[in-house]
Amino acid sequence: IIGGDECNINEHRFL
């Protein structure tokens, strides 16, 4: 999973 500084790995969503 690749996201920014705020990334919910549990929900697999990008903020």
Swiss-Prot record:
Q: What does this protein do?
A: Snake venom serine protease that may act in the hemostasis system of the prey.
Q: What is this protein called?
A: Snake venom serine protease
UniProt record similarity statement: Belongs to the peptidase S1 family. Snake venom subfamily.
- Enzyme Commission identifier(s): 3.4.21.-
Looking at the keywords, is Hydrolase present?
yes
In which tissues is this gene expressed?
A: Expressed by the venom gland.
User: GO:BP terms for this protein?
Assistant: proteolysis
Keyword entries, A-Z: Disulfide bond, Glycoprotein, Hemostasis impairing toxin, Hydrolase, Protease, Secreted, Serine protease, Toxin
Species of origin reads: Bothrops fonsecai
The UniProt GO MF terms for this protein read: serine-type peptidase activity; toxin activity
Modification after translation? Glycosylated.
Keyword Secreted found:
yes
The record's subcellular locations are: Secreted
Q: Which GO terms describe its cellular component?
A: extracellular region
Q: From which domain of life does this come?
A: Eukaryota
